[in-house]
């Protein structure tokens, strides 16, 4: 392990799979104590499997890092509050928030339901807001903190069947 992020505490949303998982693993390798946030939903947002976040946290711990799993959802303000509180309760502080949570509900817009639109917007857009807002309250008190938000090129280029994803 390196020490670039030694003694930093980082929350990574969407850390159960994909980019978020890679970010969590790299930050832990660099010395951060990591909160792996992921409710373990399928790529379309359905289901729930708390073992997804637990598995990533276990892998990080086995590799010599420090990580805990958090299965809270980012889609409610209360979930965002609980995610931030998880860092405080377990590590006494928070230094970095990385938002990578995302789902897909691909469908041509003329066939897309309002619920499919809302579900993607809730995770990508509102999910960023709920976590970042609550982190900023703490960061303001601490007088320090870093926020990293991920997006997709779909917001710039667009993909067929991903109007909701691109908008988010």
Residue ranges of each PLM-predicted region?
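A glycine-rich helix->loop->beta "capping" turn
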Residues: 6, 63-66, 86-99, 105, ...
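The beta1-alpha1 cofactor-binding region of Rossmann-like NAD(H)/NADP(H)-dependent oxidoreductases
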Residues: 50, 54, 71-82, 114
